[in-house]
Design a protein with these regions (language model features):
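Acidic, low-complexity, intrinsically disordered interaction modules
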Residues: 2-48
Length: 48
């Protein structure tokens, strides 16, 4: 899976989670990989 696909999936999940719960998730799983808050925020801030 390309990083742009990973970023898009993380972004969708994080937005939905924030919309329904009012806070960002502690971690996000994409495929078989579990990203911590710090890791997925780094990915979301990347310029691709």
């Amino acid at each position: 899976m390309e990083m742009s696909e990973v970023k898009a999936q993380i972004k969708d999940y994080v937005r939905d989670h924030y919309k329904y719960y009012g806070w960002y998730p502690y971690d996000v799983q994409v495929g078989d990989v579990l990203y911590s808050y710090e890791e997925y925020m780094d990915i979301l801030s990347m310029t691709l």
